[in-house]
Amino acid sequence: MGDDDTPVCLSVASCKGVSCWLDKLLLWALTLSITLRNTAVDCRRVDRNGLLSPNLNSSMSVVRMGQNVSLSCSSKNTSIDITYSLFLGKRYLESKRRRGGAVDFHLRISNANESGPYKCKVNDSNSSKYSQNFNFTIIQDESCSSCLLSLLLPGVLLGLILPGLAFLIYLKYKKGCTGKTLKENESKGSGDAPTQGELYANICETQKGSEQLQEIHYTTPVFKEVAPTEQEGLEDRKDDYIYSELTY
């Protein structure tokens, strides 16, 4: 009977050994899990108490020269007062302070050097963090010819309009002068006899030996028709005459 009990005792002993080994392994795994959990909690606690890196972005990344832009620097730390500072490369631009959230910086792109890189810095009394770099893309005007045309067009139109106006004024003035001359000629003339004023010069010579200069007098004769008169002794002659009265 003893021979029959020996294998049973050995199997029970081996089962106890395996069970102890499994218990030790389970205990070690449980300890490791608790340790890792505590480490994670400590890391989270450090992140909550420390600063997080801010985020810098803009509503537009492609701009033109001379355009106004805005950069937004945001932080997830909302429980403490934070100072936000903006940098262009290593050059300091501006600072704002508030309790977490986001702040906006307004800029004007005046030259190609102001395209970037921009960087935002957040800091409190204990630490500071920087954001990623941000760059703008500056595009040139599509065509300079259109700008040139818009500048030259007013000058070209002005150059065309002014000569046209001058020509119209000249024609109007010439027409007015011609009409006035015709009216004067019609008022001077009468009947079918063409009478036009001519310029005559009367030269009066001084007496010999006098030192006075010669004077030239100009006058315009006016011709008028008068009725013919009958002369005595010439009744038989039927010649027609036209008489004019000369007035100075």
Swiss-Prot record:
Chain positions of motif ITIM motif: 216-221, 241-246
Localization in the cell: Cell membrane
Summed up, the tissue specificity of this protein is: Mast cell-specific. Expressed in primary and transformed mast cells.
Kindly give the InterPro entries that the UniProt entry links to this protein.
Answer: Ig-like_dom (IPR007110), Ig-like_dom_sf (IPR036179), Ig-like_fold (IPR013783), Ig_sub (IPR003599)
Where does the record place the modification Phosphotyrosine?
Answer: Y218, Y243
Give every Ig-like C2-type domain span: 54-137
Kindly provide the name given to this protein in its UniProt entry.
Allergin-1
User: What is the species of this protein?
Assistant: Rattus norvegicus
Q: Which gene encodes it?
A: Milr1
